Curated annotation (Swiss-Prot):
Keywords for this protein: Cytoplasm, Methyltransferase, rRNA processing, S-adenosyl-L-methionine, Transferase
Family assignment from sequence similarity: Belongs to the methyltransferase superfamily. RNA methyltransferase RsmG family.
EC number: 2.1.1.-
Enzyme class: transferase
Tagged with keyword Aminoacyl-tRNA synthetase: no
Source organism (scientific name): Karelsulcia muelleri (strain GWSS)
Job of this protein: Specifically methylates the N7 position of a guanine in 16S rRNA.
A molecular function (GO) term: rRNA (guanine-N7-)-methyltransferase activity
Stated name of the protein: Ribosomal RNA small subunit methyltransferase G
Binding site for S-adenosyl-L-methionine: 73, 78, 124-125, 137
GO CC entries: cytosol
């Protein structure tokens, strides 16, 4: 059943990676009994609401080796951990201000033998490392997110696509747009035909392209 959902939407995934996704679920299930890392309700739909949701980035973006990605407000390690398993030559920096979550993520990194993931217990306001892409999942309203992270971008692009923000959100988008920037909006339901994704959006903001 678990393998089937990945084979349906991501048929090119290696079986060894799928096994690690299953292991990731088991780790979360174990620790969630003691610490509320993700909601218990979403744990019942773990592969759909956490893994598939994270992997929708992979449908659009391919990160080249040695790219640097910052995952802001990573929570239980999403979308950073699933993407780090796919792009194992890309550097992922996962940040969250809640120490207990960071401790669990460190354990996950060890259990999954991830060599390309680094964690920091801090707020993005106080974090000044530079990167190619910043990922967030329903952290705050998009204009506020842009304001918080724009200091963290490298100006020189490394990938075929421009450096930018990769943001997963639900609900409306038009009232959050900043007309200074170029956005590409993807309806996740177009490539993940699950009811959960009906109103979910993937927003790609191209950081170093401004509309004057």
């Amino acid at each position: 059943m678990k393998e089937r959902i990945f084979n349906k939407y991501f048929p090119d995934l290696d079986k060894s990676i799928i096994k690690k996704f299953i292991k990731l679920y088991k780790i979360h299930k174990f620790f969630n009994k003691k610490i509320n890392i993700i909601s218990n309700n979403s744990l019942n739909f773990f592969y759909e609401r956490h893994i598939l949701h994270s992997l929708c980035v992979y449908k659009i973006c391919y990160f080249l080796n040695k790219s640097i990605i910052i995952d802001v407000g990573t929570g239980g390690g999403f979308p950073g951990i699933p993407l780090a398993l796919l792009f194992n030559k890309t550097k992922f920096i996962l940040i969250d201000s809640i120490e207990k979550k960071i401790k669990i993520i460190n354990l996950i990194i060890k259990e999954l033998h991830l060599k390309n993931v680094y964690v920091k217990c801090t707020r993005i306001e106080n974090f000044h490392n530079k990167c190619n892409f910043i990922i967030g999942r329903a952290v705050t309203k998009l204009p506020n997110f842009i304001r918080l992270v724009k200091k963290n971008f490298l100006f020189k692009k490394k990938n075929k696509i421009n450096n930018g923000i990769l943001y997963l959100k639900g609900g409306e988008f038009e009232n959050e747009k900043n007309n200074q920037y170029l956005y590409i909006k993807y309806n996740i339901y177009n490539f993940l035909k699950k009811f959960f994704f009906k109103k979910k959006l993937f927003i790609f903001l191209l950081f170093n392209i401004k509309i004057i």
